[in-house]
Regions:
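Ser/Thr/Pro-rich, acidic low-complexity intrinsically disordered regulatory segments
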Residues: 25-29, 34-40, 68, 125
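Amphipathic protein-protein interaction modules
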Residues: 73-123
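N-terminal interaction modules that seed assembly of large macromolecular complexes
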Residues: 45-74, 82
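Amphipathic alpha-helical interaction surfaces
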Residues: 67, 88-96, 133, 137
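N-terminal amphipathic/basic-hydrophobic helices that include classical n-h-c signal peptides
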Residues: 1-22
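Short runs of predominantly hydrophobic/aromatic residues within well-ordered alpha helices
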Residues: 35, 51-57, 78-83, 123-128
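Intrinsic, low-complexity terminal and presequence regions
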Residues: 21-27, 56-59, 114-117
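Helix-rich interaction surfaces within compact, conserved domain-sized segments
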Residues: 115-141
Length: 142
């Protein structure tokens, strides 16, 4: 099996984290720095000139979790990869739980709790925070 982020297994135990989106300047500054570092690392590895956005990072996480990086993907597969990315990064927050791999090797998740209604800015912060945590746990960034 080949993984896009090195010799990492796609699934391993993650500690639960809190969803609370807090207004804390030093925390926000640290998140911004880590997010920008993550984008630099991912853009250097995977971009052909276009800047990777949140959706692109979720796609890469989905691809990593699927573990089938050389497989030719269909349009529907791309949407499913983003969904896998969302489930994977929000799993430590208690919203999803990995359930099983299907016969084609695709991971399936169980929805444990509906996501709260968040404003667009809060959604963006949550996803960036969850993505940064995902890559911190995998030691791609510090």
């Amino acid at each position: 099996m080949y993984f896009i982020f090195g010799n990492l297994t796609p699934r391993f135990a993650l500690k639960p984290v809190s969803l609370k989106v807090q207004k804390n300047e030093s925390r926000d500054k640290k998140l911004k720095e880590r997010w920008e570092t993550l984008l630099v690392v991912l853009n250097e590895r995977f971009s052909d000139g276009e800047v990777i956005d949140v959706e692109g990072v979720l796609y890469l996480v989905g691809l990593q979790e699927l573990g089938q990086v050389h497989r030719k993907m269909k349009k529907d597969d791309n949407v499913n990869l983003i969904h896998i990315g969302i489930c994977s990064v929000l799993e430590p927050y208690g919203y999803y739980r990995f359930d099983f791999f299907d016969d084609d090797g695709w991971p399936h998740f169980e929805l444990l709790e509906e996501l709260p209604a968040l404003k667009a800015g809060e959604q963006s912060i949550l996803m960036k925070e969850a993505l940064v945590e995902y890559f911190l746990k995998r030691q791609l960034i510090q």
